[in-house]
C-alpha cells in the first residue's frame, strides 16, 4: 500500500510538472506569429452532437448532445470552457511546441469537418489537427499531420506528449449513484479494455501506446 501511494504521488508530481511547463518564444521562433492572436470558434455538428472547436490550442472546447436534456430541460452540455483541456507537446531540434499556447487557423471548413492549422514562419511548413465528425454518430475522428516539418523535429522524436484533463459534470440527480458508476476506460494497443477505479482516486502509468 505504501509503495502504491508513493507511485501515485510520483505520477501526480510528474503530471503537475508537465502542466506547469511554459514555452517562451522570441521573435526568431518559427511559431512566434502563431503565439499571438484572439480566440475564435468553429462549429461542427450532425443530428446527434454539436461541437465547438477553438483556434486557441486547436481543441474541442464544448460538446452538446442534441438528443438528451439536462435537469433544466436544456440540451445536455458534456463540457464547456475550462471543463476540459488538451495540450499536445512536440519536441523540436531548437524549440518545443505546446499546442495550448498557439493560435491555429481554421481551413477546409464544412458542417462536419475542419482542419486547425498551425503555420510555421517559413515556407509552407505547418502542423494540422484534422477533425471529422462522423454522420449519425457521436464519434469524432482526430488526426495530427505535419507538412514540411521534417527539419523542425529532432531525429530521435518518435512520439508526442498528451496532457488531457477533464472535469466531469454532474449529469444525474443522484450524485452518489453517478459517482459510484462513472469511470475512465482506456485500451492499450496490444491489450483489452481496462478502466480506472470508480470508487477511489486512481492513477496508472501507461508505458505502452493507447488506442
Sequence positions of predicted segments:
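Subset of Sec-pathway N-terminal targeting signals
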Residues: 1-15, 121
